[in-house]
Amino acid sequence: MQTVLIALLRFYKVAVSPMLGNRCRFYPSCSDYAREAIQYHGAARGTYLAARRICRCHPFSAGGIDLVPPPTSEKR
């Protein structure tokens, strides 16, 4: 599942993102953040973190540096 999601993100970055222009208010960009989150946290949690990030990326947001949180070693 991770591989499929990352492939979709790469497709978005190559095919769709250039048409929309650079609009992300954060560093790293939302698509890079999503890729890192999925790689570090897996498909489910990574997608959740990416969705939260995308919801924060809007014209009224200050933006800035927002890195993917490190994985926790605790099992719940």
From Swiss-Prot:
Keywords: Cell inner membrane, Cell membrane, Membrane. It is found in: Cell inner membrane. The keyword Cell membrane applies. One of its GO terms (cellular component) is plasma membrane. It is a peripheral membrane protein. Its main location: membrane. InterPro entries: Membr_insert_effic_factor_YidD (IPR002696). Could be involved in insertion of integral membrane proteins into the membrane. Belongs to the UPF0161 family. This is Putative membrane protein insertion efficiency factor. The lineage of its organism: Bacteria, Pseudomonadati, Pseudomonadota, Betaproteobacteria, Burkholderiales.
